[in-house]
């Protein structure tokens, strides 16, 4: 009788531990999701700040310790799944000024990094020289 209860308890614990990481990934605080961001917009006749909806967060990715010709390297990045352009007028602009058209995210997803419009290198080539690896200091 004791062994039966122990086996049942082991099965319940194993099932709970198996489901927990699955739920943690979807409820993760830093996962890929919609995020409000304030940006500064300028043009000759006016300037100001606007708040847009964009995508931000972490995506699960793997990085092999060795280069392989059989296994393609890919990195997951948080990017727009669905988006549209929205017309934005800045406060303080003279009347008759053309509006800004800003891409606004409607939904986000972790997708394979597309090298045609995203810097997918491990260390960006555009990294400012003042940023150094603390291990190299």
Curated annotation (Swiss-Prot):
Pfam family, one: Cys_knot
Keyword Signal: yes
Signal peptide boundaries: 1-24
Coiled-coil regions listed in the entry: none
Keyword line: Disulfide bond, Glycoprotein, Hormone, Secreted, Signal
Residue pairs linked by disulfide bridges in the UniProt entry: 32-78, 46-93, 55-108, 59-110, 113-120
Main location: secreted
Gene3D superfamilies xref list: Cystine-knot cytokines
Keyword Transferase: no
SUPFAM superfamilies: Cystine-knot cytokines
Record localization: Secreted
TM region positions: none
One BP annotation, GO: ovulation
GO MF assignments: hormone activity
Top-level taxon in the UniProt lineage: Eukaryota
One Gene Ontology cellular component: cytoplasm
Family of the protein in this entry: Belongs to the glycoprotein hormones subunit beta family.
Record note on quaternary structure: Heterodimer of an alpha and a beta chain.
Protein name: Gonadotropin subunit beta-1
């Amino acid at each position: 009788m004791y062994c039966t209860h122990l086996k049942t308890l082991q099965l319940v614990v194993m099932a709970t531990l198996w489901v927990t990481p699955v739920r943690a990934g979807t409820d993760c605080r830093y996962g890929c999701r919609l995020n409000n961001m304030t940006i500064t917009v300028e043009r000759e006749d006016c300037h100001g700040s606007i708040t847009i909806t964009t995508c931000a967060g972490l995506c699960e990715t793997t990085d092999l310790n060795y280069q392989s010709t059989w296994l393609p390297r890919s990195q997951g990045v948080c990017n727009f799944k669905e988006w549209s352009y929205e017309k934005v007028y800045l406060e303080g602009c003279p009347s008759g000024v053309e509006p800004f058209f800003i891409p606004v995210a409607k939904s986000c997803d972790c997708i394979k990094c597309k090298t045609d419009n995203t810097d997918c290198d491990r260390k960006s080539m555009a990294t400012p020289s003042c940023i150094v690896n603390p291990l190299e200091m």
